[in-house]
């Protein structure tokens, strides 16, 4: 008993010294972490200025002195494996991390459909009960919305039926499939926050650098300045009080009373820049294999701007990590019925990004959306498509990993348009075995589009026509928020939405989102 108490006392001294001496290791480093294989990885933290920090890992020893209170070392990792121990020493302080694996690390970012937890999917319990994968781990970056926001520290969690419920469903299915295929440890760093715009994950410097982005910051600054010196805090406190009152209402009462809307300001996670500073920066520059991203719903009022803003965010992330053009795989928005936003324009922006930004690739998910629910509960298919994309584009496997993509258009003698598709795999198919294909429209020189009769011709061609359009010049496919689709390749991947025309976008010249309703002071 005395020995146990003495050991506890020594541990307590170390912990207190760790806290009081100013020596820390970045929060992302914990037991059960996964470090990127075959890479130069970075370990970092804080320590008293000029003090020596020693890092020991897998037979390597690195020593560095803290400069201006910060330290960072680099280590080499080899092939996938483990477990290892990582020791970090500063004076009398020593921190040891156990059960460290070497494998591939992916950062999963975006908004609610990436955040969507496994416990919420269809048949969740069946999946969770079998989610016993000791070599798959995930780390959820704490949801810190402003600098003084107090949040609990996170830790790497080993995937099991006990921990899987909070795993991002799409990231879970992705990592499970990659792990089974490659038999290596997979680590997922989760950063998504529901409802966030893409500019929430960028810097002020980036947004102020472009005339098409600058209005975002200027609009936000004008709102903040309109409150006066202490106006925002008063309004925010009023919102907190109103929200507390609202949460006391029963379900029937909530039918008639709107939920209070949080005022825009420095504590609102919808603000531009914020989460880049308080969440993303906490895991930079943790060495990665690549990025997984599912976002865009909150930018669907500004699809034209997204054509530049999304690539700019990708480039800024890559610059911040300092790993060159590492893979950036993302999911195109699915179908969703709405009359106030323009999902089809944002999908086009995503498609263009996949072609214009190096080492990016896109999963088509139109068919996986629920027209009536922005958060579809079936995520395994999207996760599988994302994993196939990684296997084909990142890991060099010879697999079909994308769906049919429009290549060229020719006119035929009977007034039809013949469309050629790339990525047809072993052939185009109508998934529901229908005689005609859904989602096509054609137009003449007047720009009026009419639903087209479309049929598959041969292995990789589709013939479209409408008798009302005698001289068709343009075709669109799934240029809608929501609708039916059935064009796939035989490998099960859906065709990419497209249009051949260059008509002006509805969202051109729109630089900020519509204003939300102002929250009231009381119920």
Predicted features and spans:
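Positively charged n-region of N-terminal signal peptides that target proteins for export
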Residues: 1-4
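Short amphipathic alpha-helical "recognition" segments used for binding
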Residues: 6-7, 521
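Bacterial N-terminal signal peptides
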Residues: 7-17
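Cell-envelope and extracellular/periplasmic
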Residues: 20-523
């Amino acid at each position: 008993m005395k020995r146990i108490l003495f050991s506890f006392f020594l541990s307590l001294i170390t912990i207190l010294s760790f806290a009081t001496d100013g020596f820390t290791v970045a929060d992302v480093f914990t037991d059960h972490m996964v470090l990127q294989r075959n890479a130069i990885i970075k370990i970092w933290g804080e320590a008293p200025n000029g003090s020596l920090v020693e890092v020991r890992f897998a037979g390597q020893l690195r020593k560095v002195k803290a400069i201006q209170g910060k330290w960072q070392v680099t280590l080499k990792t080899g092939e996938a494996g483990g477990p290892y121990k990582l020791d970090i020493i500063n004076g009398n302080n020593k921190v040891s991390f156990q059960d460290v694996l070497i494998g591939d690390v992916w950062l999963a970012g975006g908004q609610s459909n990436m955040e969507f937890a496994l416990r919420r999917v269809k048949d969740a319990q069946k999946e969770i009960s079998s989610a016993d994968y000791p070599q798959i781990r995930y780390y959820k970056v704490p949801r810190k919305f402003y600098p003084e926001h107090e949040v609990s520290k996170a830790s790497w969690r080993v995937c099991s039926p006990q921990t899987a419920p909070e795993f991002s469903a799409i990231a879970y299915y992705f990592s499970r499939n990659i792990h089974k295929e490659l038999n290596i440890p997979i680590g997922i760093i989760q950063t998504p926050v529901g409802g966030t715009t893409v500019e929430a994950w960028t810097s002020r410097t980036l947004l102020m650098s472009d005339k098409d982005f600058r209005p975002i910051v200027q609009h936000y600054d004008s709102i903040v300045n309109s409150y006066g010196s202490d106006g925002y805090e008063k309004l925010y406190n009023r919102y907190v009080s109103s929200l507390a009152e609202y949460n006391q209402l029963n379900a029937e009462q909530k039918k008639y009373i709107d939920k209070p809307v949080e005022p825009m300001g420095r504590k609102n996670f919808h603000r531009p820049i914020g989460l880049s500073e308080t969440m993303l920066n906490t895991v930079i520059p943790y060495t990665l294999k690549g990025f997984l991203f599912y976002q865009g719903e909150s930018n669907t009022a500004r699809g034209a701007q997204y054509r530049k803003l999304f690539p700019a965010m990708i480039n800024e992330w890559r610059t911040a990590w300092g790993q060159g053009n590492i893979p950036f795989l993302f999911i195109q928005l699915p179908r969703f019925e709405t009359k106030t936003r323009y999902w089809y324009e944002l999908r086009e922006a995503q498609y263009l990004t996949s072609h214009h930004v190096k080492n990016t690739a896109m999963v088509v998910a139109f068919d996986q959306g629920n027209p009536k629910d922005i958060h579809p509960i079936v995520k395994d298919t999207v996760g599988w498509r994302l994993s196939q994309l990684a296997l084909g584009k990142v890991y060099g496997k010879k697999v079909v990993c994308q769906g049919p993509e429009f290549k060229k258009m020719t006119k035929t003698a009977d007034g039809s348009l013949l469309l050629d598709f790339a990525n047809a795999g072993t052939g185009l198919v109508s998934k529901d075995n229908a005689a005609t294909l859904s989602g096509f429209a054609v137009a003449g020189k007047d720009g009026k589009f009419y639903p087209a009769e479309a049929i598959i011709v041969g292995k990789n061609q589709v013939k479209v026509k409408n008798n009302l359009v005698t001289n068709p010049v343009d075709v669109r496919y799934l240029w809608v928020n929501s609708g039916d689709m059935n064009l796939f390749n035989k490998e099960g991947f859906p065709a990419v939405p497209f249009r051949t025309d260059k008509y002006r976008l509805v969202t051109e010249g729109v630089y900020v989102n519509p204003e939300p309703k102002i929250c009231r002071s009381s119920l």
